[in-house]
C-alpha cells in the first residue's frame, strides 16, 4: 500500500540526508524542497516588513501544490519538509518578529487553515529534534556560505516554534527522532533503528520511542 511520509525539522538538522537514506533503504521516491523562483524574494530581503506576507503566500501556494501532487502519486514517497512548517514555523516566526502585520497574518492563517482542511494528511510525520549546538555543528559541516550567518538565537526561536507545533499536531501520527543522539550518516545501525521505528508507526503502533539502550547498541553497528 502506498505511503506518504514527511520529514520535518529545523535548518541543518539533516532532513534531506534522511530522505535519501530512507528512500534508498525502503525503495520509495524522494521529494526534496523544490528550487522555486520566488518573485518577491529580492524585495523581501530589501524590506522584510513590506514583502514578507507576499513572499510567504507564494511559498505556501507552491507547497500546497506539491503536497497535493504527492498525495496523488501512486508510489510511496518521503517529502523533505512539510507544508505545515511553512505556516506554523516560518510565517509564524516572521509574524512574531513584526515582519507580518496582524491583519495580513490573520488572512494568511485563514488561507492556510482552509486549504489544509482539503489536503489529505501524510501517513506519518518524522520530526527530527535537535539542539542548537547540534544544528550549528551540522550547518558548519555542510559548508554552505549563505547559512554561516544564521544566528543561534534564530535557530532557538525556530526550535521553540517547532516544539509548540509538534506538541499540538494531530493530523497524522508523529515519530520524534532524537537527532542529537542518532547519527544515521556515521552509524548504519542508527539508520536501521530509524527504519524499524518508521515501520512500527506505519503499521499502527502508537507508542514508539527511542530507548537509550537500543540507541547505544545501534551505534556499535
State each model region's role.
Residues 7:
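Hydrophobic anchor at the beta1->P-loop junction of P-loop NTPases
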Residues 137-149, 153-221:
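NTP-dependent small-molecule kinase module
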Residues 24-62:
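Conserved substrate/cofactor phosphate-moiety recognition/catalytic segment
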Residues 15:
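Conserved lysine of the Walker
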Residues 89-163:
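A glycine- and Lys/Arg-enriched "phosphate-lid" helix/loop adjacent to the NTP-binding pocket
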Residues 10:
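P-loop (Walker A) phosphate-binding loop of NTP-binding proteins
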Residues 1-4, 74:
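Pre-Walker A (Motif I) flank of P-loop NTPase domains
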Amino acid at each position: 500500500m502506498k505511503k506518504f511520509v514527511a520529514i520535518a525539522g529545523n535548518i541543518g538538522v539533516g532532513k534531506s540526508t534522511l530522505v535519501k537514506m530512507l528512500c534508498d533503504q525502503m525503495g520509495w521516491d524522494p521529494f526534496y524542497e523544490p528550487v522555486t523562483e520566488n518573485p518577491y524574494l529580492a524585495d523581501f530581503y530589501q524590506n522584510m516588513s513590506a514583502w514578507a506576507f507576499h513572499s510567504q503566500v507564494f511559498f505556501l501556494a507552491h507547497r500546497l501544490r506539491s503536497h497535493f501532487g504527492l498525495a496523488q502519486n501512486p508510489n510511496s514517497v518521503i517529502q523533505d519538509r512539510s507544508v505545515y512548517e511553512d505556516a506554523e514555523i516560518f510565517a509564524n516566526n516572521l509574524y512574531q518578529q513584526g515582519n507580518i502585520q496582524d491583519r495580513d497574518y490573520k488572512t494568511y492563517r485563514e488561507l492556510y487553515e482552509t486549504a489544509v482542511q482539503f489536503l489529505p494528511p501524510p501517513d506519518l510525520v518524522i520530526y527530527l529534534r535537535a539542539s542548537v549546538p547540534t544544528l550549528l555543528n551540522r550547518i558548519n559541516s555542510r559548508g554552505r556560505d549563505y547559512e554561516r550567518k544564521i544566528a543561534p538565537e534564530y535557530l532557538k526561536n525556530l526550535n521553540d516554534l517547532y516544539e509548540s507545533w509538534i506538541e499540538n499536531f494531530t493530523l497524522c501520527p508523529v515519530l520524534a527522532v532524537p537527532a542529537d543522539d542518532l547519527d544515521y550518516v556515521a552509524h548504519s545501525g542508527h539508520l536501521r533503528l530509524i527504519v524499524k521505528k518508521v515501520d512500527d508507526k506505519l503499521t499502527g503502533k502508537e507508542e514508539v520511542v527511542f530507548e537509550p539502550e537500543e540507541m547505544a547498541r545501534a551505534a556499535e553497528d
